[in-house]
Amino acid sequence: MFNAPRGVFLFAMKYIIMCGGTYRRWDTPRQLTRIKGEPIVARTIRLLREAGIEDIAITSDHAAFERFGVSVLHFENLFDVYGADNCSGVWCNGFYPTDEPVTYLFGDVVFSPAAIRTIIDTWTDDVMFFASAPPFAKEYRKPYAEPFGFKVVNQKHFREAIERCKKLDVEGRFNRRPIAWELWQVVSGGVLNMIDYTNYIGINDYTCDIDNPEDIRFFVTGEFL
């Protein structure tokens, strides 16, 4: 893995913004939450286009995502969060299946332009993971790290890791239902149930996802956007 020179694309890659699943605490999909008048998913699309990316798609079965000027890949995602720590379905099934190189971006993340640039410029011939990492930037919202996405060139490796992650879940090998961190532990061959903050690309600015109204207020009132 290394950073490519600015503006150099080593291979054609699609960017998929993941907007599936159900979060019952939200009246509408939280990827549609407006930050200073702009839906989060629209902001991500805009930042990608400003950085020179045109092959962009959204995965969702919700009709509201048809209006953003990019392809919508209709893909059933039965992951359902219905409480603070309660969920059903399999989170790892949310990645649109394809043999092509794809960068999967989580749709509820408020990305900075620099974060998008870092993701674009990171080269890999396998799979790379992006998340925040301590020590956190002063403008970062949360006291813990959050995941932002995966860049996948070796889809075979990635799909095998997803299936292994699901198998380990059934076997009770995880301390919780597996999400991005657990999937990355399997992809990278790391220790299960332990976050290694050194084996992925850390993005340390205000980039973060939204989980509750306080997160929204943080971004709406922040002067850094």
Predicted regions and their residues:
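A short, N-terminal amphipathic alpha-helix
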Residues: 38-54
